[in-house]
């Protein structure tokens, strides 16, 4: 049974994220910085600090690069609506197919306003 689970996990690998990624607070990323990371071979940037689902910076980071994945780490369910998260994901997926990874989690409800 364990071997089957290991094989399944290997099949579900996220190769499109690349071997290396960069994580920092979401407002610290710039389109120029993301492009530089992409040029250095990074496969993904992870936007920490619970960015809002409707943050306008996602599109700027994606538009300023060609292939790197922009991933949220995480959008906090206590600070956004399901509709806002879905709208953002669908809009960015249409414009930048396969390059926006929406990470959603419960985070810390006491840190939301």
What is each residue range found by the language model?
Residues 70-73, 103-105:
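Short beta-strands and strand-loop turn motifs
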Residues 1-72, 78:
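N-terminal beta1-alpha1-beta2 module of alpha/beta enzyme domains
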Residues 2, 15-23, 82-113:
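Flexible, glycine-rich active-site loops centered on histidine and acidic residues
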